[in-house]
From Swiss-Prot:
GO biological process terms on file: thiamine diphosphate biosynthetic process
GO molecular function: thiazole synthase activity
EC number: 2.8.1.10
Protein name in UniProt: Thiazole synthase
Biological source species: Corynebacterium efficiens (strain DSM 44549 / YS-314 / AJ 12310 / JCM 11189 / NBRC 100395)
One cellular-component annotation, GO: cytoplasm
Amino acid sequence: MLTIADRTFDSHLIMGTGGATSMAMLEESLVASGTELTTVAMRRHAATTTGESVFDLLRRLDITPLPNTAGCRTARDAVITAKLAREALGTNWVKVEVIADEHTLLPDVVELIDACELLVAEGFVVLAYTSDDPVVARRLEDVGCAAVMPLGSPIGTGLGILNPHNIELICSRAGVPVLLDAGVGTASDAALAMELGCDGVLLASAVNRCQDPVAMARAMRYAVDAGRLARGAGRIPKREHAVASSTFDGLASWSDQVL
């Protein structure tokens, strides 16, 4: 079970909607993933949208929408966007993103911390997209974030987890859920995140931009479960030298042979 603030989810996989080629494909992928929580950029919300919107789809599938502040460059913009989301969708949950520049899409952690502190004071349940810096993650927890979401690598790159040591360090020190966010390229990346101690994984491009989104969504679902089970099972320690899995007792020797 994944518990964030006052909500509990069976699935540890959080999906994003960005990059989906069609509503039909998005629906199939979401169902295949088994997700119960899905992020949507607030700029995709429009009261005059014709046909079924992303929010209508999530409501029909009984998936909790998690509005995010994607595209915001300052704390002020993020706070305004979060308040608009609360008014439009009736939720105080928000994934806070404050991007430093359009080339790297890396978080501006100074603006991010300011935005999160302001939103927590306003009664929001804040999930913060951040760098893989353990000090920043601790600071976000200190200001009241309900979850920290360190990146594995830059958004959309599919490079996987570039600094597994930092991710594991964040997980070992956190008192709130740690959700790997950004950089996942394939199922093994998601499994590794869970093996490192993450409580969940958020991904979008890895599914929505691959050759077979439905198959990849299903793979991610199993990968997250496998990684979580492996973490709980406890891996064997890494060793410099080989250790035989079977003993040498009972092996025939030259002296045992009858000539």
